[in-house]
Design a protein with these regions (language model features):
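Alpha-helix-loop-beta-strand connector modules within alpha/beta enzyme cores
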Residues: 148-166, 263-275
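N-terminal [4Fe-4S]-dependent radical SAM core
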Residues: 42-115
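Short low-complexity, flexible loop/linker segments enriched in glycine and/or proline
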Residues: 147-158, 178, 203, 229-233, ...
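Accessory C-terminal segments flanking Radical SAM cores
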Residues: 1-46, 50-53, 259-311
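Conserved C-terminal portion of the radical SAM core fold
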Residues: 117, 136, 183, 197-288, ...
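Generic structural signal for hydrophobic
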Residues: 125-129, 152-153, 177-178, 203-206, ...
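Core AdoMet radical
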Residues: 110-120, 129-145, 156-171, 177-197, ...
């Protein structure tokens, strides 16, 4: 089958899986993971589903907390669209196609690309990238109107877009406008681990629209220790599906190693109320697993900076 046919089949399967899990509980989820582990052919896929089997052995893990929140608070079409576009399009089909190109040409490739929200070039760059197998974008809207993403996202329904935004810009009207996009993950950006009133309001507006969102927190040497404290995790669990941690420039290597170790170990511990993602470590891990040529993509204008590190 061609990509469109395979994607359509995958989308149908995703909707069926969500329905089965809602009706049959997490036993059905484990059944699906076991089936995928059996069918997986490539080592990267086998490793992923083996980890998923391990993670789902305990029903009090943060993975179950995430799945509960997704099923309870996010529209099914959003779950399936983001999952298929990012998971199948980005990390299975797309990554495989990109790896073939890289192995042949020996040139850097990227499954995820950073850009400035509102950049007029994206109307051509996004579909062109999809034609090569790159479907995932991370857009910076921290100093512009986040609603500018809507036309781009609607015009490229097979791509997935992460949208970094200042919580104060995510007004009720803005969030209602963003809700028209099924292939969007909104990422309110907090400059410190402090859960600000603006951050809480933004999260609750997104939740009210049954949207896919992830509070994203910048940390440094002084604040890294806060993100593994139980009271901080509990407060984040009240407001977000999961939490993305990203290191500010200048954060020491020692702090980075400790944070990475704490986040990874915490994912399999019992009783953790919220899943923590590690922007720097997780994307780098995925890149290394896919190909030695995989890197962070960027089409930022010359001289521009980005809120998250790209390397």
């Amino acid at each position: 089958m061609d990509y469109n046919s395979t994607r359509s089949f995958t989308m149908t399967l995703a909707h069926r899986a969500v329905g089965d899990i809602r009706r049959g509980g997490f036993r059905q989820l484990r059944n699906y993971v076991d089936m995928c582990a059996t069918l997986a052919k490539k080592q990267q896929q086998k490793d992923f589903f083996a980890y998923a089997q391990k993670a789902l052995q305990r029903t009090d893990s943060c993975y179950y907390s995430l799945i509960h929140r997704l099923l309870d608070s996010v529209d099914e079409d959003r779950i399936c669209t983001v999952g298929v576009n990012m998971g199948f399009g980005g990390l299975i089909y797309g990554a495989s196609e990109l790896k073939k190109q890289a192995d042949l040409e020996g040139q850097p490739i990227a499954w995820i690309t950073a850009a400035r929200c509102g950049d007029e070039r994206l109307s051509e760059l996004v579909p062109k990238a999809a034609g090569h197998g790159s479907f995932v974008w991370l857009l910076d809207a921290t100093d512009t109107d986040p609603a500018q993403v809507v036309l781009l996202a609607k015009a490229n329904p097979q791509s997935a877009f992460g949208l970094l935004a200042d919580p104060s810009a995510l007004t009720e009207d803005c969030v209602k406008t963003l809700a028209a996009c099924r292939n969007l993950v909104v990422m309110p950006l907090l400059q410190t681990p402090e859960l600000t009133p603006e951050g809480c309001r933004a999260a609750r507006r997104l939740k009210a629209q049954k949207m896919f969102y992830v509070l994203t927190v910048l940390i440094d040497d002084e604040t890294a220790g806060e993100v593994m404290q139980d009271d901080w995790l509990e407060s984040m669990a009240q407001e977000t599906l999961c939490c993305m941690c990203a290191r500010k420039p200048g954060t020491s290597d020692e702090t980075a190693r400790k944070l990475r170790r704490s986040i990874v170990n915490g994912r399999l511990e019992t009783g953790k109320p919220v899943l923590l993602l590690d922007w720097d470590g997780d994307v780098r891990y995925l890149n290394n697993r896919i190909s030695e040529y995989m890197t962070f993509g960027s089409v930022l204008p010359e001289g521009s900076t980005f809120p998250l590190q790209l390397g």
